[in-house]
Regions:
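Pyridoxal 5′-phosphate
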Residues: 3
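Short polar catalytic/cofactor-binding loops
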Residues: 7-11
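Conserved N-terminal alpha-helix of the aminotransferase class I/II PLP-enzyme fold
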Residues: 12-58, 80-81, 85-87, 91
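Short coil/turn connectors at secondary-structure junctions
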Residues: 47-50, 71-74, 97-99
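Conserved core of the PLP fold type I
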Residues: 49-70, 103-106
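Conserved PLP-anchoring active-site segment centered on the Schiff-base-forming lysine
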Residues: 68-86
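PLP-dependent aminotransferase-class I/II
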Residues: 96-123
Length: 123
């Protein structure tokens, strides 16, 4: 498997086959058996009821996961070499409704308390 950007990496053949098989079943958009099975599986994994939101790209998944956790006047702390900073383009600003990525430093792309303090200091 290649874990490149979702805009450049090919779809794995097994995933492609699973999508073809799913396309021949129920109507999409959460009223189907496949969505219900996924909700149940994630609920069992996390120990609570889950409603899975299907999205087309990893960029959308990353940004939609952060959006509910951060108000428009807030920020998300990440390393300045984090995937969301380096590879997601303008998507975080759009999906976070203006909230900022607050860039922190740290050795080997791991944030440190000092890096966080320096990253949020300009606020």
């Amino acid at each position: 498997m290649q874990f490149l950007s979702d805009n450049a990496a090919p779809v794995h053949p097994r995933l492609w086959e699973a999508m073809r098989a799913a396309d021949a079943t129920d109507a999409p958009y959460d009223g189907d058996a496949l969505s219900a099975r996924l909700d149940d599986a994630m609920g069992a994994l996390f120990g609570t009821e889950c409603a899975v939101l299907w999205v087309a790209t990893g960029t959308a998944a990353n940004c939609l996961a952060l959006g509910p956790m951060c108000p428009p006047h807030g920020g998300v702390v990440c390393h300045r070499e984090a995937h969301i900073e380096m590879d997601e383009g303008g998507a975080p600003g759009f999906y976070l409704h203006g909230a900022k990525l607050l860039l922190a430093d740290g050795e080997h792309a791991k944030i440190t308390p000092e890096g966080i303090a320096a990253g949020i200091d300009p606020i």
